[in-house]
Amino acid sequence: MTRDELEKRNVGENLDALMNLDPRGYGVCRILYAGSRAYTGEPLTMHAAQVLCDAVKENDLVYIITGFVLLPHKVPEMDGTVSSMLLARALVMAFGAKPVIVCPADSVQAIEKCAAVVGLHIYEDLDIVQTLPLSMGVAAFTKSLADAPAQ
């Protein structure tokens, strides 16, 4: 193993350990991590980064699914939303990609407000997204089983 390979592995191990902190003690993350790590054979953070570098090209649409609505208040959760927006910005800055956030309709307003904070312009029309710089899309999905086939 070269010094660069060792450094990459150690950075990945540290990032994976950080992302597997489980302050609530659910244990689910560690179970899912173990299976995923066995599948990839390397730190998941570095594996994901390499897959993105290999796959994402300029102007590619990259779909990011996020968000759920907290009941009974009907407000969107925000930790996944914020993380998704930061990923969207990183994809634009690193690759010139065109991220599209796919979320429940109740989360669209939060996504739109976060877009401005991360310096991106947001549109529902993906044709517009593909023609403008620093832009991203948002696509709401229905929670209605009856409406889902039409969407």
Tell where the protein language model's regions lie, with residue ranges:
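A general structural motif
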Residues: 59-61, 96, 149-150
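Short, charged beta->alpha transition segments
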Residues: 45-55, 87, 113, 140-145
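Acidic, glycine-rich active-site loops and adjacent beta-strand->loop/helix elements
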Residues: 68-70, 105-109
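Histidine-anchored nucleotide/phosphate-binding helix
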Residues: 77-96
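Short internal beta-strands
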Residues: 98-106
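Short, glycine-rich nucleotide/cofactor-binding loops
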Residues: 36-42, 61-62, 66-83
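An acidic, phosphate/nucleotide-engaging active-site surface
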Residues: 111-151
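Positively charged, low-complexity intrinsically disordered leader regions
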Residues: 1-61
